[in-house]
Amino acid sequence: MARKPLIAGNWKMNLNHLEAIALVQKIAFSLPAKYFDKVDVTVIPPFTDIRSVQTLVEGDKLLLTYGAQDVSAHDSGAYTGEISGSMLAKLGCTFVVVGHSERRTLHCEDNDTVLAKTKAALKNGITPIVCIGEGLDVREAGEHVSYNVEQLRGSLAGLSGEDIAKVVIAYEPVWAIGTGRVASAANAQEVCAAIRATLGELASQDVASGVRVLYGGSVNAKNVGEIVGQTDVDGALVGGASLKADEFATLSAIAAGGPLP
């Protein structure tokens, strides 16, 4: 099954709403409509920017989409500081990142929490980008494949094949995030192939063949082509490079198969 590449730009805690508007405008200007037949492009801004991005995307009928960096496991209630899936859906979010390594590490989110957030996203018609990945100690011990498979199983435990078909998986080796280090294309393929095989076990081969698996970890215009060219890598979850309109547009164009913008 042909899988359309996805390039997702995770802005993390950067840019105010005015800066967000300027960046989205620059990205859209750099990517003519022809590219969107071959690649899906989404931006993942902070919560405070989403309404401004929504107004711009809908008002100018832009072809790129947008999403959120996190979602509450709860529908509503006394959960100070949390944002529900229904709120994000009302803002038109297509995607939401769940289980990012920074959430798992800094906010102590475990697989059960990631699973609950994944369910919350699906309940509200939002595509969860479920993140998994190993630290350097696991990689050096040669246990990276089994570690990621276990994390994947825990993060999707009990989901139906129908629900699994609606998720995106992002493999983000923690040791390569924001460090400038990057897994080789072969490294990325090894883990992404194991992810797809596990999806086949959790759901079916048909479902697994349709799920997009992204690579995230110091992705840039120089390495994205080789990485997304791997059989089981269907795009990238981009960090720092997504804050630079020209580079993010170039990444997207490369994933689309060119030509460069």
Curated annotation (Swiss-Prot):
Keywords linked to the UniProt accession: Cytoplasm, Gluconeogenesis, Glycolysis, Isomerase
Domain of life (superkingdom): Bacteria
EC category: isomerase
GO molecular function, one term: triose-phosphate isomerase activity
Active site (record annotation): 100 (electrophile), 172 (proton acceptor)
Cellular compartment(s): Cytoplasm
GO biological process, one term: gluconeogenesis
Protein family membership: Belongs to the triosephosphate isomerase family.
NCBIfam families in the cross-refs: tim (TIGR00419)
Protein name per its UniProtKB record: Triosephosphate isomerase
Gene name of the record: tpiA
